[in-house]
């Protein structure tokens, strides 16, 4: 259990985020956000509660909500679209999650641990979603026409063999230059630092992979320079 001073520091970090004042503007207590929230239908989670806790600056209850409740949010932002006061409970939850990671809260580690393998795959290989990865049966809300599109996909690809229309065979191919640029972005924005706080072992594996990719890129650049000189 954190001390009151630690809880206060956590709240100060939440409130100090540049997005905080934009996402929190008061509360009419109308309940529209919770009534339209998909997560509220299945979990002990209420967007209105998040707004009210932050608005009243109840640091102890805010800390308690960060143990489990904030991880139930689906980040669909329906709440932000519906709120008459222009609040963004989903945006506030995003801030709270980032602060939870920054403070190495156990709740963040518990939630993110199962995604270690996915994180490794995304960072080391790519993160594209190709059309033939999609299973229409899992998304009935897309309507019946999606079945027609999916059924003709392979035929359409033969008729229009555009390389940029990715499929599973090529969707995970990422150029060396793009990979190195992404690694730099993740470093500069603190993504890799957050990963290190959550799972040091996974971070070590990914860091070694990144170093190898950067060495490969440097070798490639040298080869290009030699070819240009010739």
Place the predicted regions along the sequence by residue.
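Ferredoxin-type iron-sulfur electron-transfer modules in oxidoreductases and energy-metabolism complexes
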Residues: 4-18, 42-70, 87-152
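Generic detector of bulky aromatic hydrophobic side chains
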Residues: 25, 53-56, 80, 219
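C-terminal, charged low-complexity interaction regions
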Residues: 149-230
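Generic N-terminal helix/loop capping motif
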Residues: 30, 36, 40-43, 53-57, ...
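Cysteine-centered iron-sulfur cluster-binding motifs in ferredoxin-type domains/subunits
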Residues: 21-40, 68-87
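Juxtamembrane/interfacial segments around transmembrane helices
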Residues: 76-82, 119-131, 164-180
